[in-house]
Amino acid sequence: MNLTKTQRQLHNFLTLAQEAGSLSKLAKLCGYRTPVALYKLKQRLEKQAEDPDARGIRPSLMAKLEKHTGKPKGWLDRKHRERTVPETAAESTGTAETQIAETASAAGCRSVTVNRNTCETQITVSINLDGSGKSRLDTGVPFLEHMIDQIARHGMIDIDISCKGDLHIDDHHTAEDIGITLGQAIRQALGDKKGIRRYGHSYVPLDEALSRVVIDLSGRPGLVYNIEFTRALIGRFDVDLFEEFFHGIVNHSMMTLHIDNLSGKNAHHQAETVFKAFGRALRMAVEHDPRMAGQTPSTKGTLTA
């Protein structure tokens, strides 16, 4: 069977990941801070595999991969004999395809890490849109962490956030910048948005409180925010900062977001219903619809332009 250049390079690239133990370990071996670039490379090679004119892996990247894995020059571009992976390696790491599938969905990379550093905040956000609802949050703002945990748990999205902010001033920059960075992560993880449902909505009650959230991953940022909190502070947290947080998400994920608190007397309940509903609506919107068969849910043919 004659392989295209891209098919041959993809096969050898996956072999490198297999030998390293996973694509994440290969990225670390090659000096990358996160594996995002290599996941995107894999996704591109898979899309172009059948195209005999595709450019494949660029020479500079090929040289970098070969250098850091101890392969001779040109190794990625040559056909090699199939060889069996040692049993111990297979048991400890699984195949490269298995490792990749654990971190990226069948439709491409849906797990990313974003770093954002300013004079006011230093933030790292990692998300997995196809996760299990786990969160690890270290922001210095406990009530905001409690709310973001609701997004993770009800959205079935793994969220890891580390933030060092200028809390000696107040929580404003921290809340806003976490929203910005989380929005950037959502946008990157969604990629070209092919096959997703695009729209999501949820009503969530908590005792006397009821909130509705509606999402459109349209590529057009817009926030409609209707919440009249019954008090200005929840503990020490300024409730005005919730709107700043959601503005950050909306403007950097490029989503349209409608938030309506329909009833509520307890401010904690009001906030919690909003964040739970947002998580559930986001889960619906990012899910892959098998009936879409990888198509973009838009008559324009794109949700990223």
UniProtKB/Swiss-Prot annotation:
It catalyses: D-erythro-1-(imidazol-4-yl)glycerol 3-phosphate = 3-(imidazol-4-yl)-2-oxopropyl phosphate + H2O. Its main location: cytoplasm. GO terms for cellular component: cytoplasm. It holds the Pfam family IGPD. It is found in: Cytoplasm. Its EC number is 4.2.1.19. The keyword Signal does not apply. One of its GO terms (biological process) is L-histidine biosynthetic process. Pathway: Amino-acid biosynthesis; L-histidine biosynthesis; L-histidine from 5-phospho-alpha-D-ribose 1-diphosphate: step 6/9. Keywords: Amino-acid biosynthesis, Cytoplasm, Histidine biosynthesis, Lyase. GO terms for molecular function: imidazoleglycerol-phosphate dehydratase activity. It is an enzyme of class 4 (lyase). Signal peptide: none annotated. NCBIfam families: PRK00951.1-1, PRK00951.1-5, PRK00951.2-1, PRK00951.2-4. Belongs to the imidazoleglycerol-phosphate dehydratase family. This is Imidazoleglycerol-phosphate dehydratase. The gene is hisB.
